[in-house]
Amino acid sequence: MGRLVEAIIASILLSLCFTITKSAPKSALITNLPGFNGTFPSKHYAGYVAIDKHRNKNLWYYFVESERNASVDPVVLWLNGGPGCSSMDGFVYEHGPFNFEPKKKNSHLLHLNPYSWSKVSNIIYLDSPVGVGFSYSNDNADYTTDDTKTASDTHTFLLEWFKMFPEFQSNPFFISGESYAGIYVPTLAAEVVKGHKNVTKPVINFKGYLVGNGVTDEVFDGNALVPFTHGMGLISDELYEETKLVCNGTYYTGGQSGVSKECAGKLKTVSDTVNLLNLYNILEPCYHGTSLSALDIEFLPKSLLTLGKTEKPMAVRKRMFGRAWPLGAVVRPGIVPSWSQLLAGFGVPCIDDTVATKWLNDPAVRKAVHAKEEKAIGNWELCSSNLEYRHDTGSMIEYHRNLTLSGFRALIFSGDHDMCVPYTGSEAWTKAMGYKVVDEWRPWMSNNQVAGFTQGYANNLTFLTIKGAGHTVPEYKPRESLDFYSRFLAGEKI
């Protein structure tokens, strides 16, 4: 009898494996990648999903099956910020299946990443909105978009994607992202929940979401810098106390009134004091190029000079750029200026994404990942110069409240050395939700070391810091990131 049961179980497991092989679109399967000579630890797929066939409007994705158990592990959508930056940024530089070793020639060597998030999850890297990365439309009007349209389009993508990959419809589904994805993630989550209420098919088995160093609310984000710079020892006690006094403890008000003249003066002093630091990780060196003319330097916004050029251990990342609201400014309603608009006519310091740019513009790579040729849709850019983007959804606080009160789990994580979207803002708004503290502030551990600190709230909300990390947390702390990511997805205590 026991052998019969074992045989039945084995047959079921075999049929599940066969289902995955059979159901996934064969045309999307990636069979090789230039630069990688080994065996993929799991299946990779890439291609386009038409979200509007009449307009030939298409979103491009790269899907990595879990290396553990694809049939039951969560499916996670990853979104980079910008707005308008490709999620292949996360694939190449943060938590994708490969580490990229740049070569002096045009080729790159790819090595397996021991801390890839595909170790424990199926993960979709999506170029969104249309006009970003390899995503495109035949109608240029589609390159004028906003938060609301982006959320709707991405929801349409998900519905179509799960039809293409029906074997994953029952898997737990999570949405994740960083920086301006602090807007993308909750607005998309709200669309998914709305789809549940409208009984939209297929039903997405949505369980929760993760946001890293995400822009959220203009007042909370705007008030984060001064306490961050003081807490990090970047400004003096005297300057902090003087600024706090003349500003009445409020450094950004939003709306039309603004702050007093005296407060504005002190805030400028704070800004000037930290001006030469690396905006995206204050521990990293900041490269100040010598190629700029005196005229360029005079007219460039000072904060541009804080865009850091860093040397990582793998020597892949040469700078930190384009992950957040331009220049690290507060997210305000209205049109978001693109980098190309801000920098028209000027030399740009500290910008070097040669690894991702060269690799993804290699015709052999584009063919391997089923992307359109350059002559059809143009070259791949880390952050698109094609978009006109409008922020139209306001504060994310109510989105988070509605989602968490509806039973969806939320992890708000912050690299504690990011000055672009400081952890102080995220800590403040999560506290201001008013939920009961159910897990008092404490250290969390990775590899038997303190990796940061966390505080848990009622209604499924967790705030987490990552010690020593900058704006793109998995890039700086890959092992620690995989640890908190794995625990959160599994519903375990971090």
UniProtKB/Swiss-Prot annotation:
Annotated Gene Ontology cellular component terms: extracellular region
Active-site residues per Swiss-Prot or TrEMBL entry: S179, D418, H471
Listed transmembrane segments: none
Signal peptide region: 1-23
Cysteine disulfide partners in this protein: C85-C383, C247-C263, C286-C350
Gene from which the chain derives: SCPL21
Family: Belongs to the peptidase S10 family.
PROSITE patterns referenced in this protein's UniProt entry, alphabetically: CARBOXYPEPT_SER_HIS, CARBOXYPEPT_SER_SER
Origin species: Arabidopsis thaliana (Mouse-ear cress)
Entry-listed glycosylation sites: N37, N69, N198, N248, N402, N460
Listed name of the protein: Serine carboxypeptidase-like 21
EC number: 3.4.16.-
Keywords (A to Z) from UniProt: Carboxypeptidase, Disulfide bond, Glycoprotein, Hydrolase, Protease, Secreted, Signal
Biological processes annotated in GO: proteolysis
